[in-house]
Each structure stands twice: as structure tokens, then as C-alpha cells.
Amino acid sequence: MIKTITGWRIFFVLLIILHHVGLDQLDMMSLGVCYFFMSSGFLLALKYPFHQLDGKAYRAFAWKRVLRVYPLHWFTLALWLGAAALLGTLVIEPLTLGLNVTLLHCWSLSYPIYYSYVKVSWFLGVLLFCYLCYPLLAHWYLPLRLRHKLIVLAVLGLIAIVVLAGTDDYSRTALYVFPPMRLIDFLIGMTLPHVCRVARSLPVIGKSANGTDAELIAVAVLSATVMMHGSNPGVRPWSDTVIWWIPQALLIMVCYLYDGREGFIGKLMASRPLQWVGTVCFELFMLQGIAALVYNYLLAPALGHLGLARLGLDPYSLLPWMIIPLGILLAWIVNRLFTRPLNRLLFSR
């Protein structure tokens, strides 16, 4: 694992969580989702080239990914259903629940279905789809010449631009969680190792002693795109996917090309605290809604009874400050008591 890629992944997870609890200034956090899929495709392409694809290898790869995705989803869903039942807000729609349990809800274009129950679980459904497609893509796509890969991406990108043009918020959100749309992010990530190999042959790229300059350029490009997103309503139809492709691709490439020679930004992203949070990243992302419920229904009332209101502070307004440490604590507990024991049981052989 490239530490800086993990660090950026955690950084975006934390910002997404803050956006979900009401920080509207972070409404561009779709860039984080784009990064997740691109970095996943990139790392898989580095580790699993699948030059020789056979049924046994595919089944082993797919089964391992299925076992990593479904148990955490079912565990989180059970927690959510239990909490909703205790609060008296539980409403069961059998079809919707069935689609959610099987992670097929992301294929629906209906808002109440793809955002049902644990709202972020659509991400797992799309990620699993990308995982299941990966061996086939790796076998047929990765061996292509770079120019042929870029032609494929250009065609897919043009299709995405045309499809998204003129979309309203409802239809754009449906496409935002639709697996084939996110597969483009994933495929871009799969292409980047080839781009990096070519970049390394150039006289300038990747040759400096450390990556400070390259990191600053990548962050500047990403920041400029964020500012364009906020100030130019004309880009809104493509604000969930297309406009982030180049900035995030550049960021991932810099992380890879300067792995082991990080500048100050890279060293921050590779720092031990972020890497430690990276060990519970999946749990943190999935449990963010549970953490919000725990705070709003348990901790905030307790803080109110302890006299926080007399200090002029509304306990409920502190959720954006408390969600991160509480979420990390819950993620660590679930990782220690559920994920790790289950992984030892499933993957010990």
C-alpha cells in the first residue's frame, strides 16, 4: 500500500463525514468518492495484473472481495435497523430491504431505494461491482497500448459528459451512484500505472529529490477545481464526476511517482495518525450514521444534563466536532471485535 494514497483517502473520508453532518461548505465532497474509485482501480492494477485469467483465479479473487464487503454491510445494516426500531422510526419495505441486503440497491434509479437504510451503503454495492469487473478488465484492457486506453477513456468520458449535460439534481444524483458511471472512475485508476510508467521516462517528471513541488502543483490543481465548482454554476451537471478526473488522477500519480520521496504534504499524509485511521477506514465510513445517532440520542442529552447548556453551548451543535472522534472510536471497536476476528476466520487458510 502506498501510504500517501491511504492518507488522502482518510482525508477525504473525514471531509465527507463532516459534510454529511451539515457542513454545507463541503458540498464538493463528491471529489472524495471519485478518488476512492480511482485509487481502488489504481492499486488493484498494480497488484493484480491478471495476465492469465482462468475460472479458478477469478473465483478466488471475487470470493475474497465478496467476503470483505458483505459482512461489514450486514453488520452495519443490523445496527441501523436495531437503532431505528428502538427509536420507533423503523419502516420496512420488503423490496427495498431485499435490494439493500444484497447490495443491488445502487442499480435502482429511485432515490428512496439507492439511499435506503444505511445511506452510504450504495458505495459498497458499486465497489463490489467494480471488483467483480476488475479481472475481466485487467485481462482485456490492461494489455492495450496507452494510446488505445486513452481513446477508450475519451469515448467513455464523452458519453458521460453528454449523458450528464442538462441533468437536474435528482437525475444527476441517481447517476452519481449508478455503477456503470462509477466504473469510469475505476477504469481511469486502472490506466494510471501505465501513464506513470511513461511519465517516469520523461526527463523532468519524478526526478526531483522529493515531491514537494509536484505535491504543491497537484494540490493547486485540485484547489482550483474546487473553487471553479463553487463559483461556476455552469459545471454543475458534471460536478459529481467529470470535473474531478484530471485533478484526482494527478494527485494519485504524484503519490505513486514520489513514493518514498514525499514532500511535506506527502509526509503529512503518510503520518502515523492517518495511517492508523486507515486501518479502520472502511468501518469509519460505514458507521458514520451510527455515530451520529449515538451522539444525538445519547451523548448530546447527557452533555445537556451535565450543564453544557448553562455555558451557552448547544450540545447538538457540537456534532461536527464530535462525529470524527466518536466515529473513529466506534470504527476501532467494530474492527477489533468484528472485522479482525471474522477475517482471521475467513482468511486463515
Show which residues each predicted segment covers.
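Alpha-helical transmembrane segments of multi-pass integral membrane proteins
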Residues: F186, I217-R340
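Hydrophobic alpha-helical segments with transmembrane-like composition
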Residues: H105-V162, V177-P179, L183, P193, ...
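Generic alpha-helical transmembrane segments of integral inner-membrane proteins
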Residues: L14, S39, W74, A78-G82, ...
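Membrane-interface junctions at the ends of membrane-embedded or membrane-associated helices
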Residues: M1, P49-K56, A60, H139-R147, ...
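Interfacial loop-to-helix transition and helix-capping segments at the boundaries
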Residues: I2-K3, L23-V33, P112-V126, G166-I188, ...
